[in-house]
């Protein structure tokens, strides 16, 4: 139904309501009036006034304006900041009434209608109505993000406008959505209170930068008086205390009456008074009431106090408990139901289906349909051809039944066109893509995801009508370039829209669904199946035979073994051939390999073939090499095709990972004919009918004639380099079954519904634009899923070509039965996203970052972190009581930590140097870092590192005395045989250990550590410890060295030996607080690195400061250091938790700050982050890099260019291929090209200046590609398409794609010119668009027009 207009020209869309019946338009009869003149609307007649004189006017001005009076009920401090409702022109205000509408829209309810389950007991049923707040309708314009705002102009209904604000995204908390940033001084009302107390009048309102210019009124005295006029303001006060909520059918009655505006607050108070929550907490009401009533007049009634307190109590209670209770209830937003139970009771649960299907539904389809009937969002994960589209069709049917809209989004234009053709016969369908808009008023719209994103950002009114959004191929979110679009759309969709997500099987389906549910605050039902409708068999094709390696998802190692045996047998036979034949065979294989490698990259000098070369390959090169390639490729493919044909496994799709290689393989089969005479006739008739819409010259394009020749023989080619109409012909003929062999790139597997009997992989490696790599399991599964036609084949066959060798079993197993690629966030900030979000009050850029899939896990843990933060804040604070007065332990601890950082920087380099290694021998005195945060430890090296233990064994002196049970010797054969080591003999009979002496034995060989490390003990009144240390734990190397007995220390664990060693260490101390002199890292250890030398001197100075601190050497140093560390750790933990919960912890926050600075520098936003005219222009740029396009327009770089030249330069914004032949440009075009490139370099340098990871040269080369400037220039001048193809080596399909996208860029530049007010640029872009829109480039899609 078209738009219905009321008499006052108020735009209205039928889909705004949504109900189960239908609407009709009936005449609205008005009352007859006696006088024809009185039949005119009241607002036409001018109001009558008394005759005015100069004296009366002067008197009125003085009384009305020069002696202002403040009314307490109107200008109170509590109300002043909310609304200044002063009627400056009351004398001319007349009660106006709009003219009555000519017609009215009324709902018609017809049986049978659906009853909701909860209404069945009552017997009576009434349709649901939507309550609309008229205050939002009247005052909420396009600046509001709420739905009850006035609709915009009809021309902006579908696409929206850059002047509109996006609708409020779903999932935002109420407190956040309604929060507004108020300027300082507004909320307090202090300045108004000063005014009421006799202060001077304020001329600068809060947040305003300029004051009011009073002009000639400045000399007048500013005297204020307060009075009350109950007769004139009493009624207004009563009227303002009410609020009216009306139903849908009231919208077209007397909506503009004055009493509507004066009754906007009553229902809120009434609703608040009826809440049982307010009555349950009288204490809360009393306290809140006191707070609310502060500053009010004493004559406030008890009823008003109760109402206001009740409302506040409800809000307070919900704010405190609502979010926490909801969080406790919703641990996970993704749920999985019992599909079997729903399947058994499906027809009981859904007795009246919105659409009937001619086949029995699968269980997952029934579960999804049941969820859709209940208005729930669903995520369906299933293999290719499993029947996911059934769920999308049911969503379309529900939207049609509910008189709402459904949107189907697809990742690529090809899928959109095909779905449009598939759904046209079933539903009211429209199509919206970048260059096509067909039936946009339809209830079911098919569009690309970018179009939907643009609608959301531009606040299109059609968003109100949408009930369902279907996301097809959701796994496309992993795409690096365009995956961010899916996340943006999901985040920006309003609350009333439900989701239908269709995806291939991925490991983290629940994780992704949980993110969507948590973001939108709605439950997502996850369903699907891992069962394939047609089971697959995976085989290897080697030496003319097929070897089965996988069946029913079970990998078969026997097939690999048989293929390997065949390879060994073939290689052994090859060894026995004559040397001459062997050399020839080797040369042939090497040539084949080199040609295969060459197929992945197209040479710059290759030009398009002429019309005369139709029968030959369209790619030039060495004829001898091409001939060798054809013979080799033809023999391989003929073997496989004949094998598949004998086994009735045709048609087959051969996936190659190069456009060039697809063409060469097809051309190699010049003598192969796979079609019958009837099929040839069908192909010929179809091609003639499809290509008849082209001009004569376009019908004879080399690509068109070459493809027709291949198609007649049952061979097809499908890749991005083909013309769009040629690709569609190939797809349609393949679906008809007349193409037997199709060579295609992987784009054919992305959503195109064209299953085959067999799928062949030419290789398991591909070039992804950066490197050659193995196929991912998800990519293999997506392409292999095209094998097997549901309802026609019992099994599908997947074949991997093996030419020279059989792949490894591990590689095959990983690709065939490995886990699919997880869904991962590709979210990234763009300038256009930032500019759009800065225009939205309800959603900040930080909120968008928080709601991205990349931040999902961090945001999910926020409640736990918040609880932990509250616990840590509630812990009692520890204090250090120093016996020497004011505690200096904090400074000492900070110096210790800083010295530790310096030491870590240089210790690794110093200790790993050969000079340090030569000093770290047994007996060397060292100082070790303490792991407990106390004073450093003096030690001695007992043993160096070995092959089995890379640590140094060091004895260190510790002040603490360990428990005696730790002093133990490891269980080992402790021999008392003197020949095995040192033994102990007493000096005298007193038996004291200090009088024992050592006696060397004759044992030789390395020392074996038999004591258990760490080994503790006490000697000479101090504790010691023996354990292993890494070289990073050495603080310094001392210049002292002690003789030690390794055997007695490490093997025997002799106490006398340890006592003697400890005593020698203690003797080395000149006093109790200092260590022996250390080796100088610079002089002794030959430290030469300048940075490390500087670090060393900083470290020594810090140690000197530490020694001068009064805590150094304190008896309580260890205890206080532990306390200082705990206090520091507590503060650090608090700061870390606060940081993790803040916006600064977001992954892309640094990039966001840098981009904000760039936008400020350019002038897109001001210092207050308000979007300026440059920013509004940048918001229009979707096809090109927004900064370059915006700066280019404001520098007026197209002023001196003709439309043909301007559109040629603009092709650099949309062209994507990197390596092309260099174009030949005119001097004018070359100058414009250089100027645009310099602009990009300048912008790249600016972004690098603000710490963005951008290289200026790469930035310019990535966003500006001038390979088609010459081609587009000639095309705009009217040159035939066949001739412009000769100017470049870019495939015809990419040329068409670039020109089509260029037309969209012209429209964007036209909109930008309108914003700028540049009429000359607007006309130039219009002329440029008309110059390129012609012939084959803009030929209509066969899916849209039919054949």
From Swiss-Prot:
Q: Where is the Helicase ATP-binding domain?
A: 369-524
* InterPro entries in the cross-refs: DEAD/DEAH_box_helicase_dom (IPR011545), Helicase_ATP-bd (IPR014001), Helicase_C-like (IPR001650), MTR4-like_stalk (IPR048392), MTR4_beta-barrel (IPR025696), P-loop_NTPase (IPR027417), RNA-DNA_Helicase (IPR050699), SKI2-like (IPR016438)
Q: What happens when the gene is disrupted?
A: Dwarf phenotype.
Q: What does this protein do?
A: Component of the SKI complex which is thought to be involved in exosome-mediated RNA decay and associates with transcriptionally active genes in a manner dependent on PAF1 complex (PAF1C). Involved in the regulation of potassium deprivation stress response.
Q: What class of enzyme is it?
A: hydrolase
List the molecular function annotations (GO) for this entry.
Answer: ATP binding; ATP hydrolysis activity; RNA binding; RNA helicase activity
Q: What is the protein's quaternary organization? A: Component of the cytoplasmic SKI complex, which consists of SKI2, SKI3 and VIP3/SKI8.
Tissue localization of expression is: Expressed in vascular tissues of leaves and roots of young plants.
* Family, similarity comment: Belongs to the DExH box helicase family. SKI2 subfamily.
Ranges where the Helicase C-terminal domain occurs = 673-838
UniProt xrefs under PANTHER family: ATP-DEPENDENT RNA AND DNA HELICASE (PTHR12131), DEXH-BOX ATP-DEPENDENT RNA HELICASE DEXH11 (PTHR12131:SF24)
Name by which UniProt lists this protein: DExH-box ATP-dependent RNA helicase DExH11
Report keywords, A-Z. Answer: ATP-binding, Cytoplasm, Helicase, Hydrolase, Nucleotide-binding, RNA-binding, Transcription, Transcription regulation
Q: Which GO terms describe its cellular component?
A: cytoplasm; plant-type vacuole; Ski complex
Give the reactions, separated by semicolons, that this protein catalyses: ATP + H2O = ADP + phosphate + H(+)
Subcellular location per the Swiss-Prot or TrEMBL entry: Cytoplasm
UniProt biased composition (Basic and acidic residues): 267-284, 590-601
Residues reported in the UniProt entry to bind ATP: 382-389
> Where in this protein does the record put region Disordered?
263-291, 566-625
Motif DEVH box, per the record, lies over: 472-475
Query: Which GO biological process annotations does it have?
Result: nuclear-transcribed mRNA catabolic process, 3'-5' exonucleolytic nonsense-mediated decay; positive regulation of wax biosynthetic process; post-transcriptional gene silencing; potassium ion transport; response to potassium ion; RNA fragment catabolic process
Q: What is its EC number?
A: 3.6.4.13
What induces the gene encoding this protein?
Answer: Induced by low potassium, zeatin and cold stress. Down-regulated by high potassium treatment.
Query: A Pfam family matched by this chain, by name?
Result: Helicase_C
């Amino acid at each position: 139904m078209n738009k219905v207009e009321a008499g006052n020209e108020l735009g209205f869309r039928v889909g705004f309501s949504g109900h189960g019946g239908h609407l009709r338009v009936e005449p609205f009869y008005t009352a007859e009036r006696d006088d024809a003149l009185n039949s005119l609307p009241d607002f036409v007649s001018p109001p009558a006034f008394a005759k005015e004189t100069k004296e009366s006017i002067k008197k009125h001005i003085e009384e009305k304006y020069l002696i202002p009076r403040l009314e307490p009920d109107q200008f109170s401090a509590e109300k002043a900041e909310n609304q200044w409702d002063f009627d400056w022109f009351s004398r001319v205000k007349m009660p106006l009434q709009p003219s009555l509408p000519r017609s009215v829209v009324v709902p018609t309810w017809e049986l049978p209608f659906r009853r909701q389950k909860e209404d069945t007991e009552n017997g009576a049923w009434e349709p649901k109505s939507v309550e609309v707040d008229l205050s939002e309708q009247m005052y909420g314009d396009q600046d509001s993000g709420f739905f009850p705002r006035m609709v915009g102009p009809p021309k902006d209904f579908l696409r929206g406008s850059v002047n509109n604000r996006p609708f409020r995204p779903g999932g935002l908390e109420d407190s956040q959505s309604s929060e507004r940033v108020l300027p300082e001084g507004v909320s307090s009302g202090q300045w108004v209170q000063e005014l009421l107390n006799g202060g001077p009048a304020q001329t600068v309102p809060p947040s305003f930068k300029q004051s009011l210019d009073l002009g000639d009124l400045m000399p007048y005295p500013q005297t204020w008086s307060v009075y009350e006029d109950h007769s004139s303001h009493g009624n207004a006060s009563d009227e303002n205390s009410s609020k009216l909520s009306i139903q849908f059918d009231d919208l077209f009655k007397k909506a503009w009456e004055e009493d509507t505006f004066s009754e906007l607050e009553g229902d809120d108070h009434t609703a608040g008074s009826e809440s049982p929550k307010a009555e349950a907490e009288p204490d809360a009401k009393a306290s809140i009431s006191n707070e609310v009533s502060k500053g009010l007049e004493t004559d406030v009634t008890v009823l008003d106090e109760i109402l206001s307190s009740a409302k506040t109590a409800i809000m307070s209670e919900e704010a405190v408990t609502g979010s926490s209770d909801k969080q406790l209830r919703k641990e996970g937003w993704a749920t999985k139901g019992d599909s079997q139970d729903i399947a058994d009771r499906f027809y009981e649960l859904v007795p009246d289906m919105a659409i009937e299907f001619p086949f029995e539904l699968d269980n997952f389809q029934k579960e999804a349909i049941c969820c859709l009937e209940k208005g729930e969002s669903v995520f369906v994960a299933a293999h290719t051809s499993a029947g996911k589209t059934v769920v999308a069709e049911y969503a379309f049917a529900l939207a049609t039944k509910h008189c709402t809209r459904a949107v189907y989004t697809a990742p690529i234009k090809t899928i959109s066109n095909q779905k449009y053709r598939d759904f046209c016969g079933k539903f009211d369908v429209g199509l919206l893509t970048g260059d096509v808009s067909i039936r946009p008023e339809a209830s079911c719209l098919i569009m690309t995801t970018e179009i939907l994103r643009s609608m959301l950002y531009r606040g299109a009114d059609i968003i109100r009508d949408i009930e369902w959004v279907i996301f097809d191929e959701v796994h496309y979110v992993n795409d690096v370039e365009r995956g961010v679009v899916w996340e943006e759309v999901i985040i920006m969709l309003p609350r009333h829209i439900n989701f239908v997500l269709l995806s291939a099987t991925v490991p983290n389906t629940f994780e992704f669904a949980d993110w969507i549910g948590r973001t939108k605050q709605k439950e997502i039902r996850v369903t699907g199946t891992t069962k394939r409708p047609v089971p697959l068999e995976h085989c290897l094709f080697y030496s003319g035979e097929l070897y089965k390696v996988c069946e029913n998802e079970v990998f078969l190692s026997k097939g690999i073994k048989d293929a390997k045996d065949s390879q060994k047998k073939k290689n052994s036979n090859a060894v026995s051939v004559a040397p001459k034949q062997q050399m020839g065979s080797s040369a042939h294989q090497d040539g084949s390999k080199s040609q295969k490698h060459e197929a992945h990259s197209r040479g710059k000098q290759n030009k398009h073939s002429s019309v005369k070369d139709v029968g030959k390959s369209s790619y030039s090169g060495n004829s001898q090499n091409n001939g060798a390639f054809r013979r080799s490729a033809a023999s391989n493919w003929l073997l496989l095709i004949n094998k598949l044909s004998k086994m009735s496994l045709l048609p087959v799709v051969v996936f190659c990972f190069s456009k060039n290689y697809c063409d060469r393989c097809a051309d190699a089969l010049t003598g192969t004919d796979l079609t019958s005479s009837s099929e040839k006739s069908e192909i010929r008739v179809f091609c003639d009918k499809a290509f008849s819409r082209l001009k004569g010259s376009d019908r004879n394009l080399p690509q068109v004639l070459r493809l027709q020749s291949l198609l007649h023989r049952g061979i097809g080619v499908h890749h991005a380099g083909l013309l769009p109409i040629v690709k569609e012909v190939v797809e349609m003929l393949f679906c008809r079954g007349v193409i037997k062999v199709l060579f295609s790139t992987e784009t054919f597997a992305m959503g195109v519904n064209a299953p085959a009997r067999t799928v062949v992989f030419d290789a398991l490696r591909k070039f992804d634009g950066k490197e050659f790599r193995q196929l991912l399991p998800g990519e293999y599964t997506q392409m292999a899923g095209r094998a097997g036609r549901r309802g026609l084949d019992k099994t599908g066959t997947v074949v991997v070509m093996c030419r020279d060798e059989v792949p490894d079993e591990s590689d095959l197993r990983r690709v065939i039965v490995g886990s699919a690629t997880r869904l991962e966030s590709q979210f990234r900030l763009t300038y256009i996203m930032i500019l759009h979000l800065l225009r939205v009050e309800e959603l900040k850029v930080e909120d968008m970052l928080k709601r991205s899939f990349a931040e999902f896990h961090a945001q999910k843990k926020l409640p736990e972190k918040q609880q932990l933060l509250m616990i840590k804040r509630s812990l009692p604070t520890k204090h250090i009581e120093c016996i020497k007065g004011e505690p200096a332990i904090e400074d000492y601890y900070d110096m210790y930590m800083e010295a530790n950082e310096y030491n870590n920087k240089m210790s690794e380099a110093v200790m790993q140097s050969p000079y340090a290694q030569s000093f770290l021998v047994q007996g060397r005195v060292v100082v070790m870092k303490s792991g407990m945060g106390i004073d450093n430890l003096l030690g001695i090296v007992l043993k160096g590192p070995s092959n089995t233990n890379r640590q140094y064994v060091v004895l260190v002196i510790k002040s603490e005395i360990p428990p005696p049970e730790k002093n133990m010797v490891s269980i080992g054969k402790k021999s008392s045989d003197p020949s095995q080591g040192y033994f102990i003999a007493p000096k005298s009979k007193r038996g004291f250990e200090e009088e024992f002496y050592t006696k060397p034995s004759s044992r030789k060989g390395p020392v074996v550590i038999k004591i258990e490390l760490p080994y503790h003990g006490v000697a000479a009144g101090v504790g010691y410890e023996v354990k292993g240390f890494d070289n990073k734990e050495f603080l310094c190397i001392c210049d002292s060295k002690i003789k030690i007995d390794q055997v007695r220390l490490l093997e025997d664990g002799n106490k006398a030996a340890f006592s003697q060693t400890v005593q020698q260490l203690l003797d080395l101390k000149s006093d109790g607080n200092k260590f022996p002199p250390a080796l100088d890292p610079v002089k002794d250890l030959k430290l030469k690195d300048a940075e490390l030398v500087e670090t060393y001197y900083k470290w020594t100075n810090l140690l000197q400061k530490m020694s001068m601190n009064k805590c150094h050497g304190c008896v309580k140093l260890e205890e206080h250091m532990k306390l200082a560390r705990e206090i520091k750790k507590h503060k650090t933990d608090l700061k870390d938790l606060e940081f993790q919960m803040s916006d600064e912890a977001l992954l892309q926050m640094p990039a966001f700050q840098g981009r904000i600075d760039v936008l400020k520098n350019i002038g897109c936003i001001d210092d207050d982050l308000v979007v300026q005219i440059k920013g509004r222009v940048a918001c229009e740029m979707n096809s090109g890099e927004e900064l370059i396009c915006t700066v280019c327009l404001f520098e007026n770089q197209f002023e001196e260019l003709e439309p043909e030249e301007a559109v040629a330069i603009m092709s650099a914004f949309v062209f994507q291929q990197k390596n092309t032949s260099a174009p030949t440009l005119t001097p004018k075009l070359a100058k414009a090209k250089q100027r645009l490139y310099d602009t990009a370099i300048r912008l790249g340098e600016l972004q690098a200046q603000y710490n963005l990871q951008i290289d200026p040269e790469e930035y310019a080369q990535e966003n500006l590609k001038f390979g088609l400037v010459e081609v587009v220039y000639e095309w705009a001048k009217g040159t035939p398409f066949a001739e412009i193809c000769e100017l470049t080596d870019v495939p015809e399909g990419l040329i068409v794609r670039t020109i089509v996208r260029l037309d969209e860029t012209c429209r964007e530049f036209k909109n930008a010119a309108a914003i700028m007010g540049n009429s000359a640029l607007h006309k130039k872009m219009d002329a440029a668009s008309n110059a390129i829109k012609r012939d084959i480039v803009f030929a209509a899609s066969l899916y849209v027009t039919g054949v």
